[in-house]
Amino acid sequence: MVSISDFEPVIPRARLGFIIPASNRMVEPQVQHFCPDDVVPHFARAGITNRHSAPLSELKQRITYQAELLGDSKVNVVVLQCTGTSMGDGPEAEEEVVKAMAEASGAEALSTARCVTSALAAIRAKKLVFVSESKEVDHSKKERYLRGQGYQLLKSKGMGLPGSDYSCTTPSDYWFQAMAEMRDPEAEAY
C-alpha cells in the first residue's frame, strides 16, 4: 500500500511572492523566465494603478490582503512590485506598508523602491540619470523619493507614456535610445 512517508517532499529552494498592479502584463513572464528551476514565483494582483491609483495609505489594505494570501503559499519573501506606488508617497509611507506586508504574510517584505535603492547602494552609485515611463506629475514623486534617499539626479525625464498598455508594449530599444540621449559622463548609474 502506498504511503506518503515513502516519498521525498517536493520543496523548492525558495518561493517568491509578488504583488503586482492588476494591469501589469510584464512581470509574470519576465520573473518566470529568469528564476532558477528551484525558485518558484507566486503572483497576486491588486488594483493599485491607473483607475485604481490612490495614495499608498489608501492602498495599504488592498496590498496587505494580497500579502496575507501570498503568505498562505509559504513564500519566503513578498515584494510590492510597483515602483511608482512604492515611491510615490515617500519612504515613511513605503516603510509602513512594507512592515504591514511582513506582518500579514509572515515573510520578509520588500518594495521595488527598496530594491532599487539597495541595488544602487551595492554598486555605490549616487549620481544618477533617471528615466521613467511616467507622466511628469508621477515622475516628480519618484524624483522626490530618490533625492530624499540621497541620490543626485544629473538628468531626469518622465517619458509620459499614457498608461500601462504602453508600459507593457514599449520595446526595449525605445528605452535604450532614451537613455543614450541622456548620457552623462558623471553618471554612476542609469
Task: Give each language-model segment a name.
Residues 67-114:
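Glycine/small-residue-rich loop that forms an oxyanion/phosphate-binding "nest" at active or ligand-binding sites
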Residues 97-165:
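Conserved beta-alpha
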Residues 76-81, 129-131, 187-190:
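Periplasmic-binding protein-like
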